[in-house]
């Protein structure tokens, strides 16, 4: 498989060959407005990761070249260490943000039809951001930040693959993509008197 096809198979939007020897960030199919794709092209081989969907680095190698596999393993291990360091830093920043939040109403919730619902609100630079903690197991690994107009973003470097936020009420488990969708599903199930744990997955890839 050629390099461009390999990258596209991982959901990375790329049209031309990148610079050799440096990490470059690219948009992804699932989040085209963000740069969740990471590539380091080395000529005979490359390291590729879609941070929104993958937790490990994938290695591409040219079909026509002799590859120093020991060097590839060392480089992959180094990339994995740096990735985990960035994820740990993001997790710590997420905790600091949540610690600064207050419970309150938010314009985004109002716009989605939930004027009486409260959430975590972070008052930052005269902007009220709705903060959604993102959990993997029992640990918060990041947050989704939602502006009053609905614009959303994650923290740089945070792990999003496998992360969820759950409205817990017991009963069945229901998956959905977005936070507002989760609120709607929760309200509908409550009206039907069907208890459920509604898991907000943040991306379609996390629902697979």
Q: Where do the model's predicted regions map?
A:
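Residue-level "edge-of-site" marker
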Residues: 20, 122, 204
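Mobile, glycine-rich extracellular loop/lid and propeptide segments
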Residues: 112
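Non-catalytic accessory segments of DNA primases and related replication-initiation nucleases
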Residues: 1-107
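Catalytic cores of nucleic-acid editing and processing enzymes
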Residues: 93-96, 121, 145
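Phosphate-handling DNA/RNA-contact segment within nucleic-acid enzymes
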Residues: 125-208
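A short acidic, glycine/proline-enriched capping/turn motif at secondary-structure boundaries
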Residues: 55-57, 115-116, 139
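Short amphipathic beta-strand and strand-loop transition segments with alternating hydrophobic
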Residues: 36-40, 118-124
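Phosphate-handling catalytic cores of nucleic-acid transaction enzymes
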Residues: 105-108, 116-122, 141
């Amino acid at each position: 498989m050629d390099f461009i096809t390999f990258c596209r198979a991982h959901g990375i939007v790329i049209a031309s060959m990148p610079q050799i020897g440096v990490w470059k960030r690219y948009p992804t199919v699932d989040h085209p407005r963000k740069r969740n794709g990471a590539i380091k092209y080395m000529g005979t081989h490359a390291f590729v990761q879609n941070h929104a969907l993958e937790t490990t680095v994938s290695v591409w190698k040219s079909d026509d070249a002799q590859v120093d596999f020991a060097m590839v393993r060392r480089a992959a291990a180094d990339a994995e260490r740096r990735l985990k360091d960035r994820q740990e830093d993001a997790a710590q920043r997420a905790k600091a943000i949540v610690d600064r939040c207050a419970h309150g109403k938010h314009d985004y919730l109002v716009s989605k039809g939930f004027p009486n619902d409260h959430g975590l609100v972070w008052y930052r630079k005269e902007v009220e951001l709705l903060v959604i903690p993102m959990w993997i197991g029992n640990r918060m690994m990041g947050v989704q930040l939602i502006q009053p107009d609905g614009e959303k973003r994650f923290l740089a470097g945070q792990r999003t693959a496998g992360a969820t936020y759950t409205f817990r009420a017991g009963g069945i488990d229901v998956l959905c993509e977005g936070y507002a969708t989760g609120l709607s599903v929760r309200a509908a199930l409550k009206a039907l008197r069907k208890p459920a744990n509604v898991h907000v997955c943040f991306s379609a890839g996390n629902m697979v």
